[in-house]
Structures are given as C-alpha cells and as structure tokens.
Curated annotation (Swiss-Prot):
Annotated family: Belongs to the short-chain dehydrogenases/reductases (SDR) family.
Involved pathway(s): Lipid metabolism; fatty acid biosynthesis
Pfam family, one: adh_short
Protein name (record): Very-long-chain 3-oxoacyl-CoA reductase
GO CC, alphabetical: endoplasmic reticulum; endoplasmic reticulum membrane
Residue positions of the active site: Y210, K214
Its EC number(s): 1.1.1.330
Catalyzed chemical reaction(s): a very-long-chain (3R)-3-hydroxyacyl-CoA + NADP(+) = a very-long-chain 3-oxoacyl-CoA + NADPH + H(+)
TM spans (from-to): 14-34
General function of this protein: Component of the microsomal membrane bound fatty acid elongation system, which produces the 26-carbon very long-chain fatty acids (VLCFA) from palmitate. Catalyzes the reduction of the 3-ketoacyl-CoA intermediate that is formed in each cycle of fatty acid elongation. VLCFAs serve as precursors for ceramide and sphingolipids.
Membrane topology: Single-pass membrane protein
Residues reported in the UniProt entry to bind NADP(+): V59, D116, D124, N143, Y210, K214, V243, T245
Length: 334
C-alpha cells in the first residue's frame, strides 16, 4: 500500500528509466553467467601445439612436487621435452627418470637444474640462461612459490620467511621469465603460464606477505600480457583456490578442492579461456569449482569489502589456532 502510494507520485518516465536500468543490469549478469558456463563446460582451450611441434621444450619451475611435478608429467605426455627446475636435485633426477621411462616410446628428453630460488644467486640464473638459450622453448610454467608455514600476523612474520616469500614468488618468477621470454618473442610463439592464487585476488589477513606477493604477480602478469600482445606469445596468470598440495596442507579433495592432476589437466585444456576471471585481462580461473566461487563473490559480496576480508581473517585465525595447538602437542610428545 505504502509502496503503491510512493510509486504513484513518481513520474512515469522515471519509472521507465529505472526499469530499463534494472533490465540492463540483470541482462548483463545473465550474459556473464552464460559466458562462464560456456568457458568452463563447452568451449575448449587453445591447442598446445600452437606453441611448438612435438619435441618443443617446456620449462617448469618448482617442478619436483605438487602442481609443478604434474605440469611436467602432463606436458611430457603431450609431447613436450621438459626442463625441470627446483631446489632438490635428487627429486629432479627421480622425476626426470620417471618421465623418460613412462614416455620412452615418445623419445621425450629432460634436462634438470637444481637451484634455490630463495638464494637469488646470479650464477644460478646464468646456468639457466646457458641451458635454455639453445632450446626451442614453447611453454614456460612459472610455478615456483612459497607461502607462510602457518597463518601469522604480519608484525610477527619471521624476517627470513618474509624475505623468502618475496624473493621466490616475485624475484624468481621475474628473472626466469626475463631469461626465457626473449626467445619466445624471437620465434613469435610461446605461452607463459604463471601460477596465481585467490590469496592475491582476495586480501588475506594473516597471510599478508604471501597475499601481497601474489597480487604483485597478478599485476605484473597482466601488464606483461599487454606488452606481448601481438607478438605470438600468450601470457596467462592462472588463479586457483585450494588444491591438495604440500603448500596448502590439505589432503582430501572435494567439489571445490581438486588434486594436482585434475587441476593441471583442466588448466592445460582451457588455455586462453577466462573461466571465472572475466574481469581481469590475461587471466584464467579454469577449475570449475574455483571459477563459480569467483563469479559468485564478484557479483554478490564483492572482493575487497570489509565483510569478505573479515571472513577471510576469521578463517585463517582458526587455521592458525589449530596449527599452534598441533605444534604444542607435538612438542609434548618429543
């Protein structure tokens, strides 16, 4: 009754205008959601052969475990020779042998380089440059990364941990890309995949340094994508929520938490498709559970608002409390 009275005093032209605006907004959301579903479930990604014939090389950093290991295995399965880069030489040798044995019939070659990205040594990067300069590198997977051992307030973050996160996640990724990308540009083909994180997309209290490092990679990768547009080199930052890896410390999969094999398979199948990352250029959220979560947050609560930030804080406070209790129990057993 009251609403009818109010509306009766509003000029018809105003009501028509408001209805038009509302219809436009709703139509935009519907179109966005249809695009999301098509990107996730219908449309295929770019054929990886675009970046080189069989025998072209792929460089994978952080290759000894988790997502990096899975990228190396699946790219080898697709016919790419693999340069494996990580800290532990024994793990790299084991993985190289596994790949060569598993794909012996395909004559897949591997090369390894053991380097500690936290050390940021010029001689390590010189070795990398010498290793890849003579190779036809078609794909670079910037996977190396480090997070906090447990969620921690920024002012309590150990200086060494803070330094390592920035050095590994940011400096390491930039230096590797600066070595590998020029050859791609010269050959006029290539793909640079950089592993991002919801931690860089959503402000994440108690993971402030890690969150900041991943936000930096988002801006850097998108900027690089703009620079290399038209050169034949595609740049894509891959956003993910949780995956069952050593870094996440999660062991059980769920609808929203895939294992590395599933996540990498989806990522490689959806290269060039934005998935849930519709509002960020040169970015993809390929796994459907993560993409739906991203779309919902962006179109309802928003990303950087106080409610979302505080909920994120509460979640990580809980994780920290459980981790500290576990450490206390373990200390008593020792």
């Amino acid at each position: 009754m009251i609403l009818d009275t109010i509306l009766s005093h509003v000029p018809k032209v105003v009501l028509t205008g408001l209805a038009g605006i509302g219809a436009f907004i709703v139509a935009g959301k519907v179109i966005s959601y249809i695009r999301l579903l098509l990107s996730l479930f219908v449309l295929s990604g770019k054929n990886l052969r675009t970046y080189g014939k069989k025998g072209t090389w792929a460089v994978v950093t952080g290759a000894s475990d988790g997502l990096g290991k899975e990228y190396a295995i699946q790219l080898a399965q697709k016919g790419f020779n693999i340069v494996l880069i990580s800290r532990t030489e024994s793990k790299l040798q084991t993985l190289a042998s596994e790949i060569q044995t598993k794909y012996a019939g395909s004559n897949i070659q591997t090369k390894i380089l053991a380097m500690d990205f936290a050390a940021n040594r010029d001689e390590d990067y010189a070795k990398l440059k010498a290793l890849v300069d003579g190779l036809d590198v078609g794909i670079l997977v910037n996977n190396v990364g480090q997070s906090h051992s447990i969620p921690v307030p920024f002012i309590q973050t150990p200086k060494e941990e803070m330094r390592d996160i920035i050095t590994i996640n940011c400096i390491g990724t930039l230096r590797v890309t600066q070595i590998v990308a020029p050859g791609m540009v010269q050959r006029k083909r290539g793909l640079i995949l950089t592993m991002g994180s919801f931690g860089g997309w959503l402000p994440t209290p108690l993971l402030a340094t890690y969150s900041g490092s991943k936000a930096f990679l988002q801006q850097w990768s998108t900027s690089l994508g703009g620079e290399l547009e038209g050169t034949g080199v595609d740049v894509e930052l891959v956003l993910s929520y949780l995956v069952t890896t050593a870094m996440s410390k999660i062991r059980r999969t769920s609808l929203f938490i895939p294992n590395p094999r599933t996540f990498v398979k989806t990522t490689l199948a959806k290269v060039g498709r934005s998935g849930g990352a519709q509002k960020i250029a040169y970015t993809s959220t390929p796994f459907w559970g993560h993409a739906l979560m991203q779309w919902w947050l962006e179109n309802t609560l928003g990303v950087g608002g106080s409610f979302v930030v505080n909920q994120n804080k509460v979640m990580h406070q809980s994780i920290r409390a459980r981790a500290l209790k576990k450490a206390e129990r373990d200390a008593k057993k020792a």
